[in-house]
Amino acid sequence: MHGEGITITCSQCGVQYTLDEYGKLSAVNVETKFTHVPDWFAWERECVKKEIADGAYQMQAPVDIYMLVDTKRLYHVGEGELSHNAQGFLLKGCDGKLTYDQKPIATYSLNSDFFWYEIGDMISIGDTKALYYCFPRTKISVAKVRIAAEELYKIAKAEKDQKKA
């Protein structure tokens, strides 16, 4: 999914909706199925869950990499590739000097944003040592990645809890 102005477009099927000043959705090129954003979002979540269950979910994108290592500023450290699948996130970059992976169990929620500080769409992963702010260089749905991270966490947590029992 991506948005521009008042229009939201599904990247997968091309369905377009507009959002009015009252928060109501109206379909542009199909019959209206959703009139409220939470309904659309719940439907998106179900689609991502199905993609994960079918083993079809994966994301891979070239990214510009910034790091937050102190409270002073965000440092641009180079370029790389961010991937996400059932095994979690993998970030490689900076001419082979950076490799960071984050398992689904470590991603209860994901910091993602649209047009973050007018730089671009952003996905942030990391740990207590550093946060990696990844700005995709190609069009991907950061909202879908966030939903997938949350759903993969739920699966990993259920598996972990089952092992304890």
Feature-to-residue mapping (PLM):
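Hydrophobic residues embedded in beta-strands of well-ordered beta-sheets
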Residues: 8, 89-90, 123
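Short, surface-exposed beta-strand/loop "edge" segments at domain boundaries and coil↔beta transitions
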Residues: 16-18, 67, 73-75, 91, ...
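Phosphoinositide-binding peripheral membrane targeting modules
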Residues: 72-81, 85-119
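Broad, structure-driven detector of short, well-ordered beta-strand segments within folded domains
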Residues: 2, 17, 79-87, 133-134
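Acidic, Ser/Thr- and proline-rich intrinsically disordered linker/docking segments
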Residues: 104-165
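Acidic, low-complexity intrinsically disordered regions
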Residues: 13, 36-39, 112
